[in-house]
Every structure is written in structure tokens, then in C-alpha cells.
């Protein structure tokens, strides 16, 4: 039951991330929205690390792939934040060298739905 509840949180964080990214783009890619995305990604990592050992091997691979993307994204994020020391309305843009693994997200969501 606990693992299902933790996995269920991911549905919220995935949707929140998509919504926050849309707002980030719509509002000029500012630091305020980038901070919301960073917090959301940190929350995703927290959940993924809790459920990893309880998931089947193929889902563990998806978790590792998604975690890798977020790790690289977060490294770029921290580097730019340190360099710019931005205010909320400042533009905050960097290019992540690792694309978002949509299939991994989809596999994790489908795994959760199979448990419910």
C-alpha cells in the first residue's frame, strides 16, 4: 500500500512538472518558474529513490533513466544559479544535454496503474 501511495505521488509531480514547464515558457523562462521546476524535480527524485527497490527490473531501469535526466538537469540548474545569482523575474535558461525520457515516465505511470 505504501509503495502504491508513493508511486501515486509521481502522477501529481509529472503533471505538475508539465504545467510548470508550460508556465515557465509562457512567462519568459524566468527564475521563479525554474525554481518551481527544480523543487518538483527534487520531489520526483525523492519518490523514485523510495520505490526503486520495490519495482521490477524493467521499471528500475526506467527510474534510473529518469533520475539520470534530472541529475544532469539539476547540475546545469545549480551551475547557472551560482553563475547568475538571479532574481525571480530574471531570465533563467540553459540547455539540458539529456532529453526528457518520456517513455520511462509512461512506463512508470502504466506500472502504477496496473497496481491500482
Task: List each language-model region with its residue ranges.
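Conserved non-transmembrane functional hotspots
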Residues: 1-116
Amino acid at each position: 500500500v505504501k509503495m502504491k501511495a508513493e508511486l501515486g505521488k509521481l502522477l501529481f509531480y509529472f503533471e505538475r512538472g508539465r504545467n510548470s514547464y508550460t508556465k515557465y515558457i509562457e512567462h519568459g523562462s524566468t527564475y521563479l518558474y525554474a525554481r518551481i521546476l527544480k523543487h518538483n524535480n527534487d520531489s520526483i527524485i525523492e519518490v523514485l529513490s523510495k520505490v526503486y527497490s520495490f519495482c521490477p527490473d524493467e521499471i528500475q531501469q526506467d527510474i534510473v533513466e529518469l533520475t539520470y535526466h534530472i541529475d544532469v538537469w539539476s547540475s546545469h540548474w545549480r551551475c547557472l544559479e551560482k553563475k547568475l545569482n538571479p532574481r525571480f523575474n530574471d531570465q533563467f535558461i540553459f540547455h539540458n544535454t539529456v532529453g526528457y525520457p518520456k517513455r520511462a515516465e509512461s512506463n512508470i505511470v502504466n506500472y502504477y496503474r496496473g497496481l491500482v
